[in-house]
Amino acid sequence: MELYEVIQEIKKKKELNNISDKFVQKLVIKELEKRQYLLEIIKKAESIRDLKRNKEFLYFFKEIRKMLHEIYGVFAPKDIKKIWRILESDIPFEQKIIDILRMSRPTKERLNFYNEIYDNIFLEKPKKIIDIASGINPVSIYFSKDKPKSYFFVDISSDILMINEYVLEQMSIGSYGYEIDIFEPSKELFEFYQYIFLWKTIPIIEKYNPGYTKELISKLNFNYLIVSFSLQSLSGRRKLGRAWRPWMHRLAKDLGFKIQKEFETKNELFIIITP
């Protein structure tokens, strides 16, 4: 059977069905390179049902889903159709924004703090922003008293990009979404941006590609880079964010960057970096 069929089966899990096929395919191929024998098993199988009877394939299948959950699923809204129903409803625009932001864990956690966050991070009036691994966070710019002229965002779901573009258009903000895998970035990521957001993304990068954060940040072109870290693990049992602070300070020092400001909300540590 074809690898495409395996990819579609992986994406049948609701939280994963909005990820681009291309991203899932690259991840599957990368992991299969470590298990060449599985590729032969897939080619010879007549159906997904047959494949799932193979214990080694089933383990691989579950591991891929687990990785996608950690990279994307845990941060993404589960119901894209519901977001469009909200946008097409007659409720006030501000309520639409609130209802949408409640649909993903990171934005829901920030919901009561967005005014404070934007007041703290915009050391200069924003003009041009890019939000890397954005999810639906760009929608929250509604709560900033200063709106940028242009807002770009990067995600691995075209559905998420379309939602962000639609909502920002309603705010008269020029916007554009890039479907980019940050592990294999394209040139758009390295253009100049006044503000770059990299929120709750670094721990995932370092888990799956240790050392890549430094390589990525060294190539970014910005006035202000705002990174953030969750203060707790997903289970809420472990304190995490402050453990990343000295790590981030060392990375900034190694790259010749400066830490301009730090602040915390209830759930998140923010660090503002300048070249």
Where are the language model's segments positioned?
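Conserved SAM/SAH-binding beta-strand->alpha-helix loop
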Residues: 157-159
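Conserved Class I S-adenosyl-L-methionine-dependent methyltransferase catalytic core
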Residues: 43-124
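Conserved class I S-adenosyl-L-methionine
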Residues: 125-137
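S-adenosyl-L-methionine
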Residues: 162-199, 205
